[in-house]
Amino acid sequence: VILLMSTQALIQSGVEKRSNKIKALSKRKTTAESWWEGECYGWWTSCSSPEQCCSLNCENIYCRAW
């Protein structure tokens, strides 16, 4: 009985962790959503760091497509 309960608890823990990972990933926005909401710059916009660009590519002070 104890082994069965331990196994069930272990399985339940794994299911909960997987569920939390799925929820976290589903909350991530697409590049288009981030751009539309003004969270990052589109191509050919002036930038000072890669994190500002939706493409994460800031080259020669401009966001590049890739």
UniProtKB/Swiss-Prot annotation:
A GO CC term attached to the entry: extracellular region
UniProt tissue specificity: Expressed by the venom duct.
Cystine residue pairs: 40-54, 47-58, 53-63
Signal sequence segment: 1-9
Subcellular localization: Secreted
Propeptide: 10-38
Family (UniProt): Belongs to the conotoxin O2 superfamily.
Protein name: Conotoxin TsMEKL-03
